[in-house]
From Swiss-Prot:
Source organism: Platynereis dumerilii (Dumeril's clam worm)
Annotated Basic residues bias: 1-18
Subcellular location(s) per record: Nucleus; Chromosome
Subunit record text: The nucleosome is a histone octamer containing two molecules each of H2A, H2B, H3 and H4 assembled in one H3-H4 heterotetramer and two H2A-H2B heterodimers. The octamer wraps approximately 147 bp of DNA.
GO MF term list: DNA binding; protein heterodimerization activity; structural constituent of chromatin
Pfam families in the record: Histone (PF00125), Histone_H2A_C (PF16211)
Residue spans crossing the bilayer: none
Family, per entry: Belongs to the histone H2A family.
Annotated SUPFAM superfamilies: Histone-fold (SSF47113)
Record's comment on post-translational modification: Phosphorylation of Ser-2 directly represses transcription.
Keyword DNA-binding on entry: yes
Protein known as: Histone H2A
Length: 124
């Protein structure tokens, strides 16, 4: 038991940690950035996988809502305005990104109720 293997299996094609976790976001790159970023002295193996999964979920959520906003405006390309509308119309995303300014995003259309014309009832 000297630690040397007896022949063993030949190394197959390497699989990325992203593909092992079933993610699109790069787990290896996120791990490297966590180590280089002076966030902690050591970074566990599961931390970058979890962070990549969370980031991928948030990106997918924002993109889906922005795609819906683009489709509502009869457009096929998502622009910053669609991102703004998607985020500000979603309660949870708006709370998460309340301190974020989106360049070229504009504002939500909003008219105060007191400024709207009064509804008159017709007497019969």
């Amino acid at each position: 038991m000297s630690g040397r293997g007896k022949g063993g299996k030949a190394k197959g094609k390497s699989k990325t940690r992203s593909s092992r976790a079933g993610l699109q976001f790069p787990v290896g790159r996120i791990h490297r950035l966590l180590r280089k970023g002076n966030y902690a002295e050591r970074v566990g193996a599961g931390a970058p996988v979890y962070l990549a999964a969370v980031m991928e979920y948030l990106a997918a959520e924002v993109l889906e809502l922005a795609g819906n906003a683009a489709r509502d405006n009869k457009k096929t390309r998502i622009i910053p305005r669609h991102l703004q509308l998607a985020i500000r119309n979603d309660e949870e995303l708006n709370k998460l990104l309340s301190g974020v300014t989106i360049a070229q995003g504009g504002v939500l259309p909003n008219i105060q109720a007191v400024l709207l014309p009064k509804k008159t009832t017709k007497a019969k």
